[in-house]
Amino acid sequence: MKIVFLEPLGLSIDRIENECKTLKASGHEVVVYPDRCPEKNIERAADADIVIESNMPLRKDFFEACPKLKMLSIAFTGLDHIDLAECERRGILVKNAAGYSTEAVAEEAICMMIGLYRHIIENDAITRSCSGLPLSPGKEISNKTVGVIGLGAIGQRTAKLAQAFGCNVIAWNRTPKEIEGVTIVDKETLF
């Protein structure tokens, strides 16, 4: 089988090559491209059996140009950049890295909220440049209303963390969903 990495996925090519030694020893061909180049995706994957990538959009034209493709491995949680209907029609197995970053992304969202309310970036710059007195310490996020767009794993975890800080959480989700302590609203209300 020919396995094509359309991009290095944030890893060194040496590391990917090292991780793929067993595959190569078993007779598989592994090709790793050193950069993200969406306009070359079709050319790079045309004769691949397996394609590995993160979040570059792959649509019907890509799958039409890759008749041997049997599997698509997405090193990312979301799949909204993949034409899943076309994959299903062609019998292409699609796998993703579901759940790998849920906690990290939710924590980052909370960090950004705290940073915004507490003027962390501005105060850091003022302090490092010795250019004056820091801004006021800002405000707490407790008792603020936090809006969450999408209640997948990341959205639910972000809502739960916001609740732990004493926030009122409102959310919009594409499909109806009930989450304890979260008020579901329409998009217009959220924005």
Label every model-predicted segment:
Residues M1-A48:
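N-terminal glycine-/charge-rich "phosphate-binding" loop or analogous flexible N-terminal tail
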Residues R44-A45, F63-C66, I141, T189-F191:
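A short, aliphatic-rich alpha-helical micro-motif
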Residues P57-L69, L84-E86:
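Rossmann-fold NAD(P) dinucleotide-binding segment
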Residues R59-F63, T175-F191:
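Rossmann-like adenosine-cofactor binding region
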